[in-house]
């Protein structure tokens, strides 16, 4: 039985209809279905057989996943790659929407068939239904389309890197050298964090510094790689920027040099004997900061000015005991009262680009009428999952923006004859999309409550030297975010509803698409032949025997080859076909049982013959060698009375007496 297809591409709006039921309305900003490269003639070919069905699906899934991995690659986060990435994204979305539309059309036919057949079983929901009528030609077109898109993307990347020397990829030694240079600066930040982490005045600033550092470097398990000169320079600028911010916010001076934190010397939690070294490091750092002058302010990455800002007042206080990961989309309000406003003067970086405050427009498209999703919500209600923190598609450069733009409530105007109002209300950790089939509805998107810190006297975080970036739209079904610069961010990939599967090499593909590796096979296992006569040998190689005969009796054919009931084959002597033994002209005898024996080579009844070189070929084929001819030289007797005659023979006379 074929399994279910969830969205193969799992991207943007296309994937939402694979995973949401008929009550969900999707916000569509662009129709990508025309971007598909599937030929019209391919739709009328033969469908994929049951035997190859999931091999085909796995192959397509691998194609989509490979393309998405390229789009998410950290080194392609620079804006110079945007056009190439957009072209690849467009192709992926086009093929994904083609599969979506095909499934929608097929499901409509299935509903009509179900209603007319009076089945006693429950009708399958849309996300449980299988896309059966996929032709082999359609698969080939989609596969080749994605393959070509990836090829063109890699080709454009090479051209871009050829024109921009600072984007040329480092070799192994170059990458190691650049990484060391960056992490030397990281060690200085670690020193500041451990020095002021428990400080009553600067502890919160130290924790914030650590959160910014984690954002620049990436996940601990998958840190950003420093693969070219531009990434190295931007990362160093970002690190220097957050160090400058720390000293500016704490109203201290940055020393010219800071002792680098070394875990092998200063980590006293792992080794208690390192406690004196740690205390010495803290003392040296505080002393260096105290003795530093203000000359460092002339060397900062960005310019700081005195400005009057409104102090953000957080609704709810919550002390942070441990370093927290930076939150995306923290909701803060500027509290103003009649006749009073809390104002303070703080040094902040001035924004270089004005944050857009206009209304965001989109298209509200009514979702198709499908049955409700199982194991999700009650009829007519879909619950959005928690807003997980994710690594975005582009590098989260700290030079982008630290400010949280206060955007007005966007109004999404529909194109279906009625408008849908988007009302933003604060609530818990989930948002609910409500709608009634057959009716247009108002959508209430209630943002999640986020963690807050203690109320601070500091104003908004300073902007850096790049265009501010904020979330323009977030798809509720997939968690995919679209930013104001046209880029996308992704959350965890959707499950494909497949059970975990472990192959012959002990590699397990889990339900969420991740892969885990077990111990490698010991290779010391004996050869094993399964019911299909396929033998797996001890070295992992596979050999194929004859296909089993499915309980048929043993059968021997005209060539004395016997196929047994278990599918094995044995070979008997070649049949003699009742012919007598036969000896050919070369004295080779083929006997009645098929064996062959070789006699002496025939002499052809020729007499012995001696050639000019005194080599004699006898009648039985043997050869004997005489003395080499003397070439008509006269007989010659040497001092020992041995005579060599003209024909090469030698005669011996009596020995010479002295």
UniProtKB/Swiss-Prot annotation:
Biased composition (Polar residues): 391-406, 428-440, 499-514, 521-531, 636-646
Cross-referenced Gene3D superfamilies: Staphylcoagulase, helix bundle domain 1, Staphylcoagulase, helix bundle, domain 2
Sequence repeat boundaries on the chain: 492-518, 519-545, 546-572, 573-599, 600-626, 627-653
UniProt region (Disordered), positions on chain: 391-531, 619-658
Residue segments, region 6 X 27 AA tandem repeats of A-R-P-[RT]-[FQY]-[NK]-K-P-S-[EK]-T-N-A-Y-N-V-T-T-[NH]-[QA]-[DN]-G-[TQ]-[VA]-[ST]-Y-G: 492-653
GO MF annotation list: peptidase activator activity
UniProt KW keywords: Prothrombin activator, Repeat, Signal
InterPro entries in UniProt: Staphylcoagulase_N_1, Staphylcoagulase_N_2, Staphylcoagulase_rpt, Staphylocoagulase_N
Leader sequence segment: 1-26
Function: Staphylocoagulase is an extracellular protein which specifically forms a complex with human prothrombin. This complex named staphylothrombin can clot fibrinogen without any proteolytic cleavage of prothrombin.
Family as reported in the entry's similarity comment: Belongs to the staphylocoagulase family.
UniProt remark on domains: The C-terminal tandem repeats are not required for the procoagulant activity.
Protein's name in the database: Staphylocoagulase
């Amino acid at each position: 039985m074929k399994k279910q297809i969830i969205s193969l591409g799992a991207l943007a709006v296309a994937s939402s209809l694979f995973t949401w039921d008929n009550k969900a309305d999707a916000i569509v900003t662009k129709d990508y279905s025309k971007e598909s490269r599937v030929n019209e003639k391919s739709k009328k070919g033969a469908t994929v057989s049951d035997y190859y069905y999931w091999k085909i699906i796995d192959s397509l899934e691998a194609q989509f996943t490979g393309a998405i991995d390229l789009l998410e690659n950290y080194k392609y986060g620079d804006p110079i790659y945007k056009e190439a990435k957009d072209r690849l994204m467009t192709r992926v979305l086009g093929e994904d929407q083609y599969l979506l539309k095909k499934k929608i059309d097929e499901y409509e036919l299935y509903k009509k068939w179900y209603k007319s057949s009076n089945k006693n079983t429950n009708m399958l929901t849309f996300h449980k239904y299988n896309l059966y009528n996929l032709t082999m030609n359609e698969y080939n077109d989609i596969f080749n389309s994605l393959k070509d898109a990836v090829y063109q993307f890699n080709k454009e990347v090479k051209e871009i890197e050829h024109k921009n020397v600072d984007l040329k990829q480092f070799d192994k030694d170059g990458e190691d050298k650049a990484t060391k240079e960056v992490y030397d600066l990281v060690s200085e930040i670690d020193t500041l964090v451990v020095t002021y982490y428990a400080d009553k005045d600067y502890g919160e600033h130290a924790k914030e510094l650590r959160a910014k550092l984690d954002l620049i470097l990436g996940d601990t398990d998958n840190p950003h790689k420093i693969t070219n000169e531009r990434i190295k320079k931007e990362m160093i600028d970002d690190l220097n920027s957050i160090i400058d911010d720390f000293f500016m916010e704490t109203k201290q001076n940055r020393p010219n040099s800071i002792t680098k934190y070394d875990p092998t010397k200063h980590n006293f939690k792992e080794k208690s004997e390192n406690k004196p070294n740690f205390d010495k490091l803290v003392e040296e750092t505080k002393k260096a900061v105290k003795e530093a002058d203000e000359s460092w302010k002339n060397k900062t990455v960005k310019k700081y000015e005195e400005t009057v800002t409104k102090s953000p007042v957080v609704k709810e206080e919550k002390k942070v005991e441990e370093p927290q990961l930076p939150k995306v989309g923290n909701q803060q309000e500027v509290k103003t009262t009649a006749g009073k406003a809390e104002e303070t003067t703080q040094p902040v970086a001035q924004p270089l680009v004005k944050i857009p405050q206009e209304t965001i427009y989109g298209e509200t498209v009514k979702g198709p009428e499908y049955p409700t999703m199982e194991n999700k919500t009650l009829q007519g209600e879909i619950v959005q999952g928690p807003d997980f923190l994710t690594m975005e598609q582009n590098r989260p450069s700290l030079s982008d923006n630290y400010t949280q733009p206060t955007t007005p409530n966007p109004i999404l105007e529909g194109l279906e004859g009625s408008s849908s109002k988007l009302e933003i209300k604060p609530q818990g950790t989930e948002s609910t999309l409500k709608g009634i089939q057959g009716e247009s509805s108002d959508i209430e998107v209630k943002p999640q409550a986020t963690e807050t810190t203690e109320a601070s006297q500091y104003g908004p975080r300073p902007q850096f030297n790049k265009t501010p970036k904020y979330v323009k739209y977030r798809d509720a079904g997939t968690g995919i975010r679209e930013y104001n610069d046209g880029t996308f961010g992704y959350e965890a990939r959707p499950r494909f509803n497949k059970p975990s599967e472990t192959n012959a090499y002990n590699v397990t593909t889990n339900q969420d698409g991740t892969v885990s590796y077990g111990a490698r096979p010991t290779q010391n296992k004996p050869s094993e032949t399964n019911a299909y006569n396929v033998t797996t040998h001890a070295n992992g190689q596979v050999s194929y025997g004859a296909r089993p005969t499915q309980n048929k009796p043993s059968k021997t054919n005209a060539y004395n080859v016997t196929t047994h009931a278990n599918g094995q084959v044995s070979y008997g002597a070649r049949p003699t076909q009742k012919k007598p033994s036969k000896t050919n002209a070369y004295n080779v005898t083929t006997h009645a049982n098929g064996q062959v024996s070789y006699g002496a080579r025939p002499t052809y009844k020729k007499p012995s013959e001696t050639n000019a070189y005194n080599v004699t070929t006898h009648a039985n084929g043997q050869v004997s060698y005489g003395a080499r001819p003397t070439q008509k030289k006269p007989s010659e007797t040497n001092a020992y009375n041995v005579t060599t005659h003209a024909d090469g023979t030698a005669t011996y006379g009596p020995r010479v007496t002295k």
